[in-house]
Swiss-Prot record:
Oligomeric form and interacting partners: Homodimer.
Keyword set, alphabetical order: Cytoplasm, Glycolysis, Lyase, Magnesium, Metal-binding
Binding site for substrate: H159, E168, E297, D322, S374, H375, R376, S377, K398
Protein name as annotated: Enolase
Species this chain originates from: Cochliobolus lunatus
Amino acid sequence: MAITKIHARSVYDSRGNPTVEVDIVTETGLHRAIVPSGASTGSHEACELRDGDKTKWGGKGVTKAVANVNDIIAPALIKEKLDVKDQSAVDAFLNKLDGTENKTKLGANAILGVSMAIAKAAAAEKGVPLYAHISDLAGTKKPYVFRFLSKNVLNGGSHAGGFLLFQEFMIAPAKTFAEALRIRQGAEVYQKLKALTKKTYGQSAGNYGDEGGVAPDIQTAEEALDLIVDAIEAAGHTGQIKIAMDVASSEFFKDDEKKYDLDFKNPDSDKSKWLTYPQLAEMYKSLAEKYPIVSIEDPFAEDDWEAWSHFYKDGDFQIVGDDLTVTNPEFIKTAIELKSCNALLLKVNQIGTISEAINAAKDAFGAGWGVMVSHRSGETEDVTIADIVVGLRSGQIKTNAPARSERLAKYNQILRIEEELGDKRLFAGNKFHTAINLYL
């Protein structure tokens, strides 16, 4: 089916920063996508094109990316008359039009907006939900697998003020079958956590971080984990909920010294207390022995490959690569060869097209890895990732706290999909890491 119109505009994400929205019009109507944005980004991610004009939006404007869609991509793609159902051909054309290795000419935010909208147009032409179209593109088998939800209920690092080192502390309901019940459990723990945080640290401690989690001014991971365990108990869900963490350690890695500064938000940090990677690895193991931690994301810096491989040898939980792998097949291949981690955090805007994101997931699955589909800290009302996680059959999604409408939009889409599928789905449960292999 021919594309009759492509139009991009600048809209706003959840942090109030500009981002790219793309409309594609075909005979089935208008199909819209909005591109998310990250705060703690890997240096190897595809290029997010920003204007750089500090007098407007602090340099974060996207008028160049919008113009690239309207003035370059739109006329070229319409003229090419590609079938919207042929996602790989469309994405290959977009990459060829850009002509750079990292999408620096047109911008990954321009290209991805078009790629996402194309996928929605294709699903509409086929008369199927987006998750079913994604499943067709990925070649995944049925039934669909429902997921291990990672809800970021406590924010630190670059996503919040205060001195808390680690960026995300997540809860993951893992014992019940119904998606609706797992979302309910997460919401109940979150409400208890807010109440406990305010009681312990004062009313302002219940304020939100970028991703909807509470952001109290606490100092250590142990404080954060104790709060979460207490909230789980107060909600009556002890034993039913696990914990995951995103350390985002690239944010506090000191490259010159090859050490990790656990007090990186303090300008007067004591260098004598900085840790080597074996020392940091022991800290993680100690935390995992004390708390029900099942997954750790970015435990080491993105280029500290030796540290990752060292940790992988002894780790008995999921080790997730985000900044390390940036949803890029080349980095995923290296991580597989070096035995650096055993799971991929899949962020479509890190690589810039739907096709490349699907291929990254397939590479990870092929190595026996888990795949966790993820939002970004600068999110929007677009719910595409909810359909992607179902279509890929990955069994894991990270879309964070049950607060703020841009986060809840994904949970609400998950509920709709669950209702639509009825009993035609499986629950990953404690087998979330290998959900792709689950069959009736």
